[in-house]
């Protein structure tokens, strides 16, 4: 079992590195020009699979030490620190001065040294963010983290949101907009991009800016950054709404079925995906004898009952059911 | 007793419920009122808003806290009930969302107090012990357990963090809030010391009363470097006259003689002088006013904190502290005169066990403080940017979750203890049972500590005399005896005191203030 996890880890690590390499665009065999390079972690080499040339040797293996059975051991035996992350303004590579006034042996230090450390600590804290742009980033990233934490958004999406914000900052899109607004739209965009959409209403509930501003800023940055966002698939909303309404799997699959068949007939175009999903769930709940009122569904999906009624009518007509 | 009855009795001690019962009782008590106690203690989160001119202060009032049953939050945002087996297989944490009532209040200076927002909000996730009251499988029948992939014979009593099962090791500590008299040596002389680990709400302070080689009493306690004269301290606490001090320590003529020596050496005669003297010790080189303020603060904050109680006035607490110090002095003198033996630290009456609930309470307290700091920071920042202050936008639930999960996952507890949580030993079924009923002494295993490792007569019926590892941990890691009964501390001390008072005990602080005025306040 250990063997397999290790392999998995190595594989993912190798994959990541390959991705990084491809970004740099230098990874092809200097001898035969093939891009079929293989990383052999057993020998710490990068080998060309076609001609056999060793492109790189003595690579550093960032993985943990041999034999680590659980999380704790893996951490202890790891030869490197935490991976860099985009969610921190310095990518998590800061030096921090510990607040404990102890030397390397754990002994207390003299009062003179202590006040010196105090000063160093203060200045370290001050110069960590070197300019306004950096401060801006620090503030925005902590906002993203705060909102993501309130929404229960996973780590990977926070990473994406941070990258979007960083790009916006680099292209000078923040000017004239509030930091919070751009941060919120970056998070909204990241959620959509990663296929776990949150509606603007949900996002604005935890954000410190208004819905209107988020929408406006989002449109602007997605256009400027060329995010090419496709309309959200209403099916993405189904599991969440269903679990909030405490509906069974059966209703979920029925709702998905309704969405699929009706969307094929072009009913979805131009309609709000949340409303569409809500109507399908409402219809499915009726069909499966687990009726929820329009009010209940509307509350969860944060749409109006009118929207649900309209979409519902269209959907059952298209399905050929008469409710 | 009949043979059959005996058999039934002994069998019931081996029933499933009994094996990890101490864990369940302790953890359930924590969920039921321990968590609420911590929140009530905290009461409110103050902010620095309002320090500036024309700005009204803002703070957060904390209300009821509750945990639901374990749930998992999927990436798409849906939330579903989680069963232990799923948590193990998916490498996720078996934890339940915790909700707390919070209200942001502004005003109080010029404007009227105004509640800006009040909501019950999710503040984080609490790891739930498998088999506890809040566990999703509690009350399930064997068939139902098998249905969801659970082992009906599994005793529970552990947590599941990131898919790994972790037990919190019961730890054996010296009893707090108890006077322990013992011999010590200082500069080659034998001296007598009375010790008390005074503990209240997670704050622990060691108070020492020493009788040095001149026969003078000295007291040391946190935040005062070195030691101060016993007489000075009791005078600062309001026990002024010579007669009263002597009377409070002991009536024994020989001890009175010792006390008189001490009084002769005293530098101060009145309470004011004593507090001034103390002020010079705790804040030397500062202004006079600050010295006094600091001295009073130190007395009320760091000296014998366990004597504080809600609803008891500071004045009364101080005099109780003086009486308590007199008891400690008496213990010192009695030891010096050979009237009593040194207290046995290995005696089980002088030990208290910290079970999972107590450990979780410590953890929750620091986690809540961390959350409070974060809320304060978020509030100040939102206020600075003139945003509307709402509860939902200032609480980062990750803060609390992280602080609760990380120590259980790594075993690095608050207060620098490590190895508190351990991976459940699944070598075989017996291994699990033994592991859940194991307890650990905090003494270092690299030092001999021969007495602590020895089997003590008072362990009879409580600790298994033979189950202990070989090697460096021998005698420091122990296991419960099968028929061990673990009693819990009193939840409501007031009830206990009322009861004692009705039985004729006089001078209990906060209970019988009106009935006793001149009579002795000794216990």
From Swiss-Prot, chain A:
Q: Where is the composition biased (Basic and acidic residues)?
A: 1-16
Task performed by this protein: Stabilizes TBP binding to an archaeal box-A promoter. Also responsible for recruiting RNA polymerase II to the pre-initiation complex (DNA-TBP-TFIIB).
What are the start and end residues of every segment in region (Disordered)? 1-35
Answer yes or no on keyword Translocase: no
Q: List cellular component terms (GO).
A: transcription preinitiation complex
Report the protein name in the record: Transcription initiation factor IIB 7
Keyword Membrane appears in the UniProt entry: no
| Classification via PROSITE patterns | TFIIB, ZF_TFIIB
Q: Per its UniProt record, what InterPro entries does this chain match?
A: Cyclin-like_dom, Cyclin-like_sf, TFIIB, TFIIB_arc, TFIIB_CS, TFIIB_cyclin, Znf_TFIIB
Curated annotation (Swiss-Prot), chain B:
| Keywords for the protein's UniProt record, in alphabetical order | Cytoplasm, DNA-binding, DNA-directed RNA polymerase, Nucleotidyltransferase, Transcription, Transferase
Where primarily located? cytoplasm
Q: Which GO terms describe its cellular component?
A: cytoplasm; DNA-directed RNA polymerase complex
Q: Which GO BP terms apply?
A: DNA-templated transcription
Give the span(s) annotated as Disordered: 501-523
Record's compositionally biased regions (Polar residues):
513-523
Known catalytic reactions: RNA(n) + a ribonucleoside 5'-triphosphate = RNA(n+1) + diphosphate
Annotated compartments:
Cytoplasm
Q: What class of enzyme is it?
A: transferase
**EC?**
2.7.7.6
Q: Which GO terms describe its molecular function?
A: DNA binding; DNA-directed RNA polymerase activity; ribonucleoside binding
Q: How does it associate, per the subunit comment?
A: Part of the RNA polymerase complex.
**PANTHER family for this protein:** DNA-DIRECTED RNA POLYMERASE I SUBUNIT 2
Report the sequence similarity comment from the record.
Answer: Belongs to the RNA polymerase beta chain family.
Primary role: DNA-dependent RNA polymerase (RNAP) catalyzes the transcription of DNA into RNA using the four ribonucleoside triphosphates as substrates. The Rpo2 subunit (Rpo2N and Rpo2C in this organism) is implicated in DNA promoter recognition and in nucleotide binding.
Name of the protein this chain belongs to: DNA-directed RNA polymerase subunit Rpo2N
Task: Record the organism.
Answer: Halobacterium salinarum (strain ATCC 29341 / DSM 671 / R1)
């Amino acid at each position: 079992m250990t063997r397999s996890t290790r392999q998995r880890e190595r594989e993912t690590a190798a994959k990541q590195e390959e991705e990084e390499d491809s970004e740099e665009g230098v990874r092809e065999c200097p001898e035969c020009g093939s891009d079929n390079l293989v990383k052999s972690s057993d020998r710490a080499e990068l080998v060309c699979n076609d001609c056999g040339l060793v492109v790189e040797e003595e690579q550093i293996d960032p993985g943990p030490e041999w034999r680590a059975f659980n999380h704790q051991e893996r951490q202890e035996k790891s030869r490197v620190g935490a991976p860099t992350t985009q969610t921190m303004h310095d990518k998590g590579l800061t030096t921090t001065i510990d607040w404990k006034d102890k030397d390397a042996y754990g002994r207390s230090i003299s009062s003179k040294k202590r006040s010196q450390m105090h000063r160093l600590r203060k200045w370290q804290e001050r110069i960590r963010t070197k300019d306004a742009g950096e401060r801006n980033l620090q503030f925005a990233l902590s906002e993203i983290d705060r909102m993501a934490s309130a929404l229960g958004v996973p780590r990977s999406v926070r990473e994406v949101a941070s990258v979007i914000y960083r790009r916006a900052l680099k292209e000078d899109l923040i000017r004239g907009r509030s930091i919070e607004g751009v941060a919120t739209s970056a998070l909204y965009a990241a959620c959509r991009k990663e296929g776990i959409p949150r509606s603007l209403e949900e996002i604005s509930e935890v954000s410190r800016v208004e819905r209107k501003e988020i929408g406006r800023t989002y449109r602007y940055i997605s256009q400027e950054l060329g995010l090419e966002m496709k309309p959200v698939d209403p099916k993405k909303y189904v599991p969440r709404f269903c679990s909030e309404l405490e509906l069974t799997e059966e209703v979920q699959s029925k709702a998905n079925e309704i969405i699929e068949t009706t969307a094929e007939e072009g009913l979805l175009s131009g309609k709000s995906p949340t409303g569409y999903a809500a109507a399908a769930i409402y219809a499915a709940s009726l069909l499966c004898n687990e009726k929820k009122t329009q009010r209940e569904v509307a509350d969860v999906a944060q749409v109006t009952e009118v929207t649900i009624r309209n979409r519902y009518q269209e959907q059952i007509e298209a399905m050929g059911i008469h409710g | 007793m009949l043979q059959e009855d005996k058999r039934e009795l002994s069998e019931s001690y081996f029933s499933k419920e009994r094996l990890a019962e101490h864990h369940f009782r302790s953890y359930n008590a924590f969920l039921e009122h321990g968590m609420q106690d911590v929140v009530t203690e905290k009461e409110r989160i103050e902010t620095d808003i309002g320090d500036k001119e024309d700005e009204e202060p803002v703070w957060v009032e904390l209300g009821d806290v509750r945990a639901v049953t374990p749930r998992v939050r999927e990436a798409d945002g849906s939330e579903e009930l989680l069963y232990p087996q799923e948590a193990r297989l998916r490498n996720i944490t078996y934890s339940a969302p915790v909700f707390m009532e919070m209200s942001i209040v502004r005003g109080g200076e010029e404007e009227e107090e105004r509640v800006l927002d009040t909501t019950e909000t999710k503040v984080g996730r609490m790891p739930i012990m498998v088999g506890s009251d809040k566990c999703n499988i509690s009350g399930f029948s064997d068939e139902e357990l098998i249905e969801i992939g659970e082992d009906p014979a599994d005793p529970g009593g552990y947590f599941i963090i990131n898919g790994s099962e972790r037990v919190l090791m019961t730890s054996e500590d010296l009893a707090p809030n108890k006077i322990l008299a013992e011999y010590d040596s200082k500069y080659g002389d034998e001296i007598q010391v009375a010790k008390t680990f005074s503990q209240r709400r997670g704050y622990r302070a060691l108070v020492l009363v020493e009788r040095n080689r001149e026969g003078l009493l000295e007291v040391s306690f946190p935040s005062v470097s070195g030691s101060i004269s016993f007489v000075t301290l009791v005078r600062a606490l309001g026990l002024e006259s010579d007669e009263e001090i002597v009377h409070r320590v002991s009536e024994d003529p020989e001890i009175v003689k010792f006390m008189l020596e001490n009084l002769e050496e005293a530098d101060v005669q009145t309470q004011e002088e004593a507090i001034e003297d103390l002020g010079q010790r705790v804040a030397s080189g500062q202004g006079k006013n600050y010295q006094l303020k600091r001295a009073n603060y130190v007395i009320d904050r760091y000296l014998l904190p366990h004597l504080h109680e809600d609803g008891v006035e500071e004045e009364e607490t101080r005099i109780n502290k003086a009486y308590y110090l007199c008891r400690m002095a008496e213990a010192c003198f009695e030891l010096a005169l050979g009237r009593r033996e040194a207290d046995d630290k290995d005696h089980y009456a002088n030990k208290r066990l910290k079970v999972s609930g107590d450990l979780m309470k410590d953890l929750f307290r620091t986690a809540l403080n961390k959350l409070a700091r974060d809320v304060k920071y978020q509030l100040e920042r939102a206020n600075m940017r003139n945003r509307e202050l709402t509860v939902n936008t200032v609480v980062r639930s990750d803060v609390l979750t992280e602080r609760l999960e990380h120590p259980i996952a790594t075993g690095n507890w608050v207060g620098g203890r490590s190895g508190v949580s351990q991976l459940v030993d699944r070598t075989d079924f017996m291994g699990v049972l033994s592991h859940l009923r194991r307890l650990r002494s905090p003494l270092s295993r690299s030092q001999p500590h021969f007495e602590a490792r020895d089997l003590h007569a008072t362990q009879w019926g409580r600790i298994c005399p033979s189950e202990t590892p070989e090697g460096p941990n021998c005698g420091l890691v122990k296991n419960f005896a099968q028929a061990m009964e673990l009693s819990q501390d009193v939840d409501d001390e007031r009830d206990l005191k009322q009861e004692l008072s009705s039985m004729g005990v006089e001078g209990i602080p906060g209970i019988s203030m009106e009935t006793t005025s001149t009579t002795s306040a000794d216990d």
